[in-house]
């Protein structure tokens, strides 16, 4: 088994690839298979942001592994105006939905309840297969409502770490 504990800086070469959907890239503990069909165990530090497409990991045996975002069923949302798109983003954010933001569009994981809401808001919703790369969020690190022990969840804003738009 290829055992992985560490994220590393980008590398020019790698020995294996992990093709993972967003849910799998969000887990700190995961058993999966590499593209080369090798059994892999991920044991990453808890509380970190999800793995991103193109991120690199280092296995215990020294091998470098590249993470690839596997295409998955998404809703691609467009609207007839910037106001309507902003309103759709507001309502999705109010539901704490993981959201990928592009120039004039939004993408989110397929969900029939959210599709019905978006339809009611007048959005155009198209089902597509694509890699899902949602925003990390302004505060990153996790989602907590509890006030008990909140000093453990005092994350500084990460506004400077938003991904590059394509």
Swiss-Prot record:
One of its GO terms (cellular component) is cytoplasm. Keywords: Chaperone, Cytoplasm, Nickel, Nickel insertion. The keyword S-adenosyl-L-methionine does not apply. InterPro entries: UreE, UreE_C_dom, UreE_N, UreE_N_sf. SUPFAM superfamilies: Urease metallochaperone UreE, C-terminal domain, Urease metallochaperone UreE, N-terminal domain. Coiled coil: none annotated. Its main location: cytoplasm. It comes from the Bacteria. Involved in urease metallocenter assembly. Binds nickel. Probably functions as a nickel donor during metallocenter assembly. Belongs to the UreE family. This is Urease accessory protein UreE.
């Amino acid at each position: 088994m290829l055992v992985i504990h560490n994220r590393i800086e980008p590398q020019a070469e790698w020995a294996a690839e992990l093709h993972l959907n967003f849910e799998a890239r969000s887990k700190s503990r995961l058993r999966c298979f590499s593209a080369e069909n090798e059994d892999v165990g991920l044991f990453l530090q808890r509380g970190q942001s999800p793995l991103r497409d193109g991120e690199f990991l280092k296995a215990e045996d020294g091998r470098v592994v590249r993470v690839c975002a596997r295409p998955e069923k998404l809703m691609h949302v467009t609207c007839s105006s910037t106001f309507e798109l902003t309103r759709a983003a507001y309502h999705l954010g109010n539901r704490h939905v993981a959201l990928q933001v592009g120039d004039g569009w939004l993408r989110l994981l397929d969900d029939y309840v959210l599709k019905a809401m978006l339809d009611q808001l007048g959005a155009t919703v198209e089902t597509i297969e694509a890699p899902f790369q949602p925003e990390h969020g302004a505060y990153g690190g996790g989602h907590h409502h509890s006030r008990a022990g909140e000093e453990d969840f005092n994350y500084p804003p990460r506004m400077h770490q938003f991904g590059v738009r394509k």
